[in-house]
Amino acid sequence: METPTPLPPVPASPTCNPAPRTIQIEFPQHSSSLLESLNRHRLEGKFCDVSLLVQGRELRAHKAVLAAASPYFHDKLLLGDAPRLTLPSVIEADAFEGLLQLIYSGRLRLPLDALPAHLLVASGLQMWQVVDQCSEILRELETSGGGISARGGNSYHALLSTTSSTGGWCIRSSPFQTPVQSSASTESPASTESPVGGEGSELGEVLQIQVEEEEEEEEDDDDEDQGSATLSQTPQPQRVSGVFPRPHGPHPLPMTATPRKLPEGESAPLELPAPPALPPKIFYIKQEPFEPKEEISGSGTQPGGAKEETKVFSGGDTEGNGELGFLLPSGPGPTSGGGGPSWKPVDLHGNEILSGGGGPGGAGQAVHGPVKLGGTPPADGKRFGCLCGKRFAVKPKRDRHIMLTFSLRPFGCGICNKRFKLKHHLTEHMKTHAGALHACPHCGRRFRVHACFLRHRDLCKGQGWATAHWTYK
């Protein structure tokens, strides 16, 4: 009697199974709270895995945070994972500590006269977003009349921060009081502050620059104002300066007071009735794609015989006639016309070579960093500029110029401790440490570079052929 074979189980139809239920949990402030915890650990010295030596000072940090914020640290730690890093002597300790605070917290408060030093360090660390925003801040401050040079005994402060509401950068400066750090969820980005002044004192201006994100295709060239050429009569070269001009008329924008929430422990400042001719000013700039441009407005000659060039940058959507001028001494020589072009030496790649400068024998130290200009592109097509005055036709050459001017050697060999300025130099050098030498199985010749070994192996026909045709081993 045959035993019936059991039938295989029939799989359930997929239509019968209910769809799996999923839930999603999201914490919008998770990234900021995580960075705050990392910053607190850094300040307490917990879980730090790298020591940074800057001009004799030792700062503790986390390798993962440094590598994520700076391409310089990313490549340096990738090539040599050492517990202690010594930064070049050109990096100032105070400026680097400020940028380290910016990396961990997303905000930085500093005196305005220290802004060029922070720009210099950010260029060396290849933090191009910070360099771009510092250049924008310098340009906006000069355009609005609030330069770096302090007037009288007033101390100017700047607050550089990243805001989650606008996704950009903002800066506030006030000659009378330190700005209040505000939260994007509790106050309006366009809020204003009223400085306190005694009887007979001038009412200080509160400057607020807010960056608004904008898509690339929505750029509007009509909003950019062309900067006018000016000649500076100051004898000191290589400096950026400016003062707050007194306005002579009412501000064209209607100003409305916005209530603000102050942190605990701080009292609200006394609000004085502002004269109609001196209201606080608010300037807005738009964040554009990082394509630095440059516009040479003219050159002039000082009475002492030293020729200086003034680089003028357009002011954007601001009011006033202020400009940002970089004075570049070119040494004694024939003078050129007021705004006419002059012949300048160029290198093998067609880039301008500015004589003189801020080297060891120069009068000052040149400021290097990418600049972004408005207006029409130059006729020669070199629209990527550096703060030192050089211009380049392509962006990689400009970035390479900034790296080489600092004499930094960030790329080090982990085997022989040799250091190189450029990454491809290290790549070529690492071929010498490829391990065992490549030996030809036919003639026994040995090669260091694998590509040379492959070419020889295709040509080699044995020991006799190699002896007859090769005069060296």
Swiss-Prot record:
Segments of skewed composition (Gly residues): 355-364
Residue spans of biased composition, Polar residues class: 227-239
Transcription regulation recorded as keyword: yes
Chain residue numbers at which the record places covalent cross-link Glycyl lysine isopeptide (Lys-Gly) (interchain with G-Cter in SUMO2): K286, K293, K307, K382
Disordered: annotated segments: 177-279, 293-376
Alphabetized SUPFAM superfamilies for the sequence: beta-beta-alpha zinc fingers (SSF57667), POZ domain (SSF54695)
Primary residence: nucleus
An example molecular function term from Gene Ontology annotations: RNA polymerase II cis-regulatory region sequence-specific DNA binding
PROSITE patterns linked to this entry: BTB (PS50097), ZINC_FINGER_C2H2_1 (PS00028), ZINC_FINGER_C2H2_2 (PS50157)
All residue ranges annotated as the BTB domain in the record: 48-112
InterPro entries: BTB/POZ_dom, SKP1/BTB/POZ_sf, Znf_C2H2_sf, Znf_C2H2_type, ZnFinger_BTB_dom_contain
Biased composition (Low complexity): 182-196
ZnF C2H2-type: positions: 411-433, 438-460
GO biological process, one term: regulation of transcription by RNA polymerase II
Compartment(s) where it occurs, according to its Swiss-Prot or TrEMBL record: Nucleus
Keyword Transcription listed: yes
Annotated crosslink Glycyl lysine isopeptide (Lys-Gly) (interchain with G-Cter in SUMO1) location: K286
GO CC list: nucleus
Alphabetical UniProt keywords: DNA-binding, Isopeptide bond, Metal-binding, Nucleus, Repeat, Transcription, Transcription regulation, Ubl conjugation, Zinc, Zinc-finger
Stretches with biased composition (Acidic residues): 211-226
Function field: May be involved in transcriptional regulation.
Protein name: Zinc finger and BTB domain-containing protein 9
Organism: Homo sapiens
